[in-house]
């Protein structure tokens, strides 16, 4: 790294930072996708039950009785919230990928030996 100009060293530091941010965003996105899949499966299952079915939900460490309508409404709200979060994470991931691509090109350009003209 001694022969690398300070400007390029700074860009490399920024590149590493973007890579770490991207890794976190991807992990969060995977977690949200998993939660969304589980919530949709639960909603499908509950909607297939008769209207007078007894439904339970977990609240912290407790399991409490609720109505089918309440459970459906809560799951739909949760799904909507997760979809909004997932869209935000996808936008963030796209922006970070664009920044990484741009910065990588800048670094490569800065490290390229000047051509004799």
Curated annotation (Swiss-Prot):
Disulfide bonds: none annotated. Keywords: Chaperone, Cytoplasm. InterPro entries: PFD_beta-like (IPR002777), PfdB (IPR012713), Prefoldin (IPR009053). The keyword Nucleotide-binding does not apply. Its main location: cytoplasm. It is found in: Cytoplasm. SUPFAM superfamilies: Prefoldin (SSF46579). Pfam families: Prefoldin_2 (PF01920). GO terms for molecular function: protein folding chaperone; unfolded protein binding. GO terms for biological process: protein folding. The keyword Isomerase does not apply. One of its GO terms (cellular component) is cytoplasm. Belongs to the prefoldin subunit beta family. Molecular chaperone capable of stabilizing a range of proteins. Seems to fulfill an ATP-independent, HSP70-like function in archaeal de novo protein folding. Heterohexamer of two alpha and four beta subunits. This is Prefoldin subunit beta.
